[in-house]
């Protein structure tokens, strides 16, 4: 059985080098044989050891857990927010360069590696131009959405043409935490609050904005993929329906939420079982967060979840093949 890891991180080293040469934030700085990413005017940073740009090491870790037929879908992850903190022209150049490198890896590893696009959302026209190139010319299989675009949220009305175009192109919109929201109250404890709860809050609010704003209502074919088993949302769906009656929405928020696809990056089987019960087996995608989490650990959690053969096949393979058009 082909296994599709939908939550895999790899970056071309050229991207980190370009960001290291920037004179202002966001940027990276060289640390030994790796880097660290500095954002929010330098108040936040993420260590980026060499494994982040070692694709062979990423493949090796995946194969050791799920065998040589493993396929990876590469997402920008936390760094999706990097472009949207930059001046628009700089972001345009870097988005093109990044997407070209991701597409190059896809060509070098056909059927093994699939890439997703970064776009400069601070300028809608630029974002549309980059999106069309990434999907139409480079054959990338999705587009990444940060939690914030500068000081704007993802439901800014000017972004409506972007969501319309994503739906028309029939590629998924990937919502991964970007550490750009709520930073003032998530500090301290060696980033323990940010990394444990903050990132889930970040992506959960992003998805709620897509729902409350009517974006998912206006674009019923838009496929949204939320990482980390749906963050906080499946556990509070009843409260969301109770407290958030949105004028103009013909359905309860939870009805849109159940359209969302979520991955299995969650270090306990209880979370997986809850996600399965809430979203249904057709909406769950296998993911490892490699290199941030161990593929072996990701498999162990699913093994502990007592899945039927049919559900395992959907999670490990067929759902992702459909969402990312891999067949």
What residues fall within each predicted segment?
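Helix-coil boundary/capping segments in enzymes
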Residues: 1-327
């Amino acid at each position: 059985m082909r296994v599709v890891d939908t939550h895999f991180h790899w970056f071309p080293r050229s991207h980190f080098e370009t960001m290291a040469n920037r004179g202002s934030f966001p940027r990276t700085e060289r640390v030994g044989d790796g880097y660290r990413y500095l954002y929010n005017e330098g108040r936040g940073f993420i260590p980026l050891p060499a494994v982040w740009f070692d694709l062979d090491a990423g493949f090796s870790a995946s194969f050791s857990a799920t065998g040589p037929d493993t396929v990876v879908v590469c997402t920008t992850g936390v760094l999706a927010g990097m472009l949207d903190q930059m001046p628009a022209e700089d972001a345009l150049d870097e988005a093109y360069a990044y997407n070209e490198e991701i597409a190059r890896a896809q060509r070098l590893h056909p059927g093994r590696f699939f890439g997703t696009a970064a776009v400069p959302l601070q300028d809608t026209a630029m974002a549309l131009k980059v999106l069309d190139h990434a999907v139409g010319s480079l054959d990338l299989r999705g587009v990444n959405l940060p939690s914030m675009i500068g000081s704007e949220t993802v439901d800014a009305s000017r972004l409506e043409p972007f969501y319309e175009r994503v739906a028309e192109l029939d590629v998924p919109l990937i919502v991964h935490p970007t550490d750009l929201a709520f930073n003032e109250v998530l500090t301290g404890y060696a980033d323990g609050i940010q990394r444990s709860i903050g990132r889930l809050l970040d992506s959960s609010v992003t998805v709620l904005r897509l729902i409350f704003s009517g974006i998912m209502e206006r674009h019923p074919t838009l496929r949204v993929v939320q990482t980390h088993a749906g963050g906080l949302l499946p556990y509070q769906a009843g409260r969301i329906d109770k407290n958030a009656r949105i004028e103009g929405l013909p359905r309860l928020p939870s009805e849109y939420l159940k359209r969302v696809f979520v991955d299995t990056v969650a270090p306990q089987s209880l979370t997986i079982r809850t996600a399965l019960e809430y979203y249904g087996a057709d909406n769950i995608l296998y993911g490892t967060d490699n290199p941030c989490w161990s593929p072996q650990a990701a498999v162990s959690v699913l093994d502990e979840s007592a899945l039927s053969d049919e559900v395992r096949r959907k999670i490990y393979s067929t759902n992702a093949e459909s969402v990312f058009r891999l067949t």
